[in-house]
Amino acid sequence: LFNSRNKLIEFERMFSEFVDCEYVILTSSGTSALYVLLKAYGLKKGDEVIVPAYMCEKVIRLLLDMRYKVKLVDVEKETYNLSIDDLNEKISENTKAVIAVHMFGNPCRMDEISDIAHDHGAIVIEDSAQCICAEYKGKKVGSLGDSAFFSFGEGKPIITISGGAVTTNDKKIAKKAREIVSKFKQKTNGKILLKLILYYIIKNRRIYKLLYNKIQKRRMKRWDELKEVMNLDSLKQKFTDMQASIGIIQLRKLKCFNKIRYKNSMFL
């Protein structure tokens, strides 16, 4: 774990092969990855971005704090993914981007979404935070839209304490994204190590039971935080070598993890 020189390059290569996407740029979080993509595509204040009405609140908060015009589109009741019919109704020539969220591991109907978006001159960004491994018509999520972003944060299929990634087959966008990330501050491995130790302690069954109420109260406070302005500078941090080392280990074990998740889902 500590012999982590060149691990960033190795993890990017492995994840690129896994997603079957030419370019991968690692970031400090999934939110940071989306921030980088929006900047790389050159979206300006006031530009319209379409998102599903049911999705991670952090994405909405980021878009509003970057001063984009957010337009909500209904979701399908079967999958909670973007409704094709409502997208057709809501999209306009003012729409610059459509964020397609693969909710709960269910891939969106990406061919239809892309056709509609491109007909109106809009780009399609996949939110693949909850959907590593899933495929749509033989292709992995994260390689279906114009670009995509992943999260490696708490509760995700791959957890590197925090972290995220941009994936794209567009060389120009990849270059811009890498230039943006290169100017970010370097996080220290010490903070990552401390969080890793705390994770192991908290996830002990007895300790988690004692701390459960406090953890739930902290999660509920997130709704109040939505009223606050997001500190965009907090997104401008680099993914560390230590996180890359953790990511490599987790990616190698992902099939095993997914088998356990599938087995556990049978209890629901």
Which residue ranges define each predicted feature?
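Glycine-rich phosphate-binding segment of PLP-dependent enzymes
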Residues: 1-3
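Phosphate-binding glycine-rich loop
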Residues: 5-48, 57-66, 72-74, 139
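Short amphipathic alpha-helical/adjacent loop interface patches that line ligand
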Residues: 12, 53, 84, 265
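Alpha-helical structural signal in soluble globular domains
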Residues: 14, 62, 66, 90, ...
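A short beta-strand submotif of the Rossmann-like class I SAM-dependent methyltransferase core
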Residues: 26, 51, 100
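Active-site phosphate-binding strand-loop segment of PLP-dependent enzymes
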Residues: 78-160, 165-176, 183
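Active-site region of PLP-dependent enzymes
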Residues: 132-137, 147-267
